[in-house]
Amino acid sequence: VCIKVGLTLFAGACLCGGIQAHSLNGEKEDILNTMKSATRYMMDSVSYRGGFVWNYLPDLSRSWGEMEAKRTMVWIQPPGTPSVGHLLLDAYHATGDKFYYEAAEKVANVLIWGQLECGGWNYVFDFAGENSLKEWYETVGKSGWRLEEFRHYYGNATYDDLGTISAAKFLLRMYVEKNDPAYKAPLEKVIHFILESQYPVGGWPQRYPLRYDHPFEGKEDYSSFITLN
């Protein structure tokens, strides 16, 4: 049994929206309390400084993104940290409770911390630092079957699996919500990244800045190819 990031909060948000629509008697307060309790647990106990991976053992002794993760790691690609941020903003809209907006701010600050100098995001980053992340790539990442990009540390950003885009969308929502200037600079940074990395034909590479240093099983490095997912 694993803790699935965001599922309890998402269910609560949906139920809360339904209660507002149908005015069910006596249940709204219970659901709101349960929803807040679950969110507080996810933010205070499950997250690492406001960042998430995908799955956790109930005792939090092990955790996974697309592969097993260190406790200090934060996963970007859905259903990782930006996905939780979107849920928190949805919960804020459903309830009007600033508790959820403040939790979303915490998630946004984590994403800003993990934004690469180029403006985008990798699949994952590590609060323990780049050397810790490189060590993970050299051990856990290299054991990945059919996960070629985890077998090599590029040090650049990815468009694959909505990595950079999911983080960018969430920061855009945070900025539009209250026009908080704290989100303007990182948002402009990722917009510049997106424009700079676009090919003249209109598509975008799997990863950027472009790298060609990881041919795999006799085939050329595909990370500069236009990506479709």
PLM segments and residue spans:
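Extended ligand-binding groove/face enriched in aromatic
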Residues: 46-229
